[in-house]
Each structure stands twice: as structure tokens, then as C-alpha cells.
Amino acid sequence: MTVMHSLRSRILLARVAVQLPLAEAGDRLPGLVIGGADVAVLTTGGAVDRRRDLKILRDLERYLGQRLLLAVDTPEIVADVRVLFPGERDRSRPHQWALLGQVVQERGQIVEPDGAFQFLAVPGTPLGSPLLRAALENQPPLRQDSVPWFAAGGLDAGSVQALAETGVRRVWLTEGGTVEEVEQIDEILRWAWGEDPAYEDYLGFAVRA
């Protein structure tokens, strides 16, 4: 597994999350990591072959775990990071340092986030949606007391550029994306972070978290 004390720092510093089926991760993920992915959300679609899926995850942890956070969508596979999609109620964590993320559907989940979750995924489209505005206003991305959140959707470099111009600093590519797309998106967000007035103070805070 990843180093326990670094999990919170790593989610605070993450810019690009990619979502893809766990079964495809062995082939696709190495390239996406090179492209700049910081988090991989590995989905099972509710059909878990625990022995097979655990082996895939452990192999990924062994080869890529120091370069990105590996998240799963089910409590049936023990992982340092898990995402609760709508309808999932099990908030169990395998250890006290494990991270839980929530895919939000309501404004209240952003304005008054549940303390059980260490990060959120907010629908990133359409641009200027009520949920996106609520996240930008109530959880400014590089404010130290904000819950880190990702604007999620089938995003490309153009839409990420538009999001970054509104203040978004993290994105979650629900369709995974190509290596080239991830490279472009990572560059857009790297520049946006560097130009953000809050960046220097936030960086120091996040590294020490």
C-alpha cells in the first residue's frame, strides 16, 4: 500500500484524476501516469471478482502506487482510497489513514460537507452549474480549510481550460482520456496552480499535512 502519512498530502496536491475500469487499468494506467494523472478511480461496475480484482490492484500498487493514488469504488476490495458513488452507503475504512471520497449530487453536500469524506467529486458540466458555483464559493480550491474537490465529467482540454479560468483547480476525467489529453490537461492545471495567488501558502500547508 502507499505510505500512510502521505495520503492526505497527496490528495491535497492532486490535480488530475482519471476514472477507468479496474480490469483495463493494467494496460491503460501506466501511460496515463506518464501523462500526469495523480489519482486513478478504478471501477468494478458492481461485479467484483475479489481474488482477481485484488491481484490487479496489488500489482498496480507495486508498480505505480508511489506515483499516484489508487481508488476503488467498492468496500469489498481493501484499498487506501475509496470513492462512494450515489447509492453507496458503506463508509467503512480499512485503516484510520484511509481516504473516502464522495460523488456529490446536492448543494448541501458541498456547503456543509460530511466529515466522513476527505475529498469530493462535483459535476463539472455544464460550466457555471449551481453545484459548480457552490463548490467554488464554499470550498475555494486552494484554501487551506476547504475540502479538496474535483470537477468531474467527460472533459477535454478545452473544457478544462474553461473550468480553470473560473477557478477550478482539480478535474476528474470520467472517461479516462488519452495520454495526450491527460498531458494537455495536466499542463493547463499546473499553470493555473502556479498563477493562483494562494498557491505558495497552500503548497506549504499541503506538503506538511
What are these regions (language model features)?
Residues V39-W97:
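N-terminal active-site wall of soluble small-molecule enzyme domains
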Residues D27-L29, L70-V81, R107-A116, E137-N138, ...:
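Catalytic cores of alpha/beta
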Residues H5-R8, L54-G65, D90-A98, L132-Q144, ...:
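Surface-exposed amphipathic alpha-helices with a cationic face
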Residues M1-D27, R208:
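N-terminal amphipathic alpha-helix/helix-capping segment at the start of soluble metabolic enzymes
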Residues L12-L20, A40-L42, L68-V72, R82-L84, ...:
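Hydrophobic faces of well-ordered beta-strands that scaffold small-molecule active sites
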Residues L32, A40, L163:
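Conserved, mostly hydrophobic/aromatic
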Residues L42-T44, F85-S92, F119-P130, A164-W193:
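Glycine-rich phosphate-binding active-site loops on the catalytic face of alpha/beta enzymes
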Residues T2, A17, Q144-A209:
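C-terminal alpha-helical cap/extension of soluble enzyme domains
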